[in-house]
Amino acid sequence: MSESTWAVPDSRKLTFDDADEPVTKLQVRVVNGTVNVVGTEESSARLEVSSVEGPPLIVTRDGATLTIGYEDLPWRGFLKWLDPQGWNRSAVVSLAVPAGADVEVGMVGAGAVVSGIRGRTEVRGVSGDTTLVKLAGPVRAESVTGNLEAQAVTGELRFKSVSGDLTVIEGAGGRVAAESVSGDMLLDLDPTARATDIRLTTVSGEVAIRLPHPADARVEANTASGAVSNAFEDLRISGNWGTKKITGTLGAGNGTLRATTVSGSIALLRRPADEEPPFEDAPGENPPAGDAASGGPAPEGASSPADDQSGSAGSTKKVL
């Protein structure tokens, strides 16, 4: 298929229906606004641009690759777009693509929701928050100040940020690797998940991990000056002054959990075996307000999953 290009200066809907060569790669690059991507079982791809402010969006179909962005905002090196002059634009973009497609999203000041993708997902952002829902393929996310929330992600998850927070709900992937300078990290693991390799590193951020009970992992968590708390009797807390550690083996030790922070606190929480939803409210507490993420593209920015909250059960040992 030859390359086709469209300039989109305002609201518009486009359908890319080519059964012989469906879209297998999606690239989206926007400044401000919202990006919503949902995977479907259809062979066609659909684009809905709800609003455009500033220069028009450029839509390009080159074979199996669909690109939405600006001529002056390349995928590589787009973090250079910290010049305020480049922020005088905005777009709300929603896409439905085959679930097996690879998805790349780059945004400056924009928020993104990606759901239902089985291919590779890569998200790069400066200040916008990102929500990932039910992704089965490998995921890589990079951010400066934007937060990342991943819900029911079963693929490998890698996250890097300067000050953005990481929240994982119903985590069921085989590997989670996260690095941050000051961002907090909150993980709640799905009790049905296979053995997981978790490696978390932050300088001043706090780390909280809720594991199913019984759990199956070799644990090594340490902080130089923060507090530590542990809800598992099989784990040992050592160190009273300076560096504190939580070490030991849970179950057969098939998984790995390593967490390191310099000045932040570390908490290992336990979910009872019979607890069903993650972060369930304790009796008497009011549930947080918020709407769940939309399962499909919406003309106006889709809302992200309900705000998360953590909880633990059982006795907790804490060292200050």
Regions found by a protein language model. Give the residues of each.
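Intrinsically disordered, low-complexity terminal regions
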Residues: 1-143, 147-320
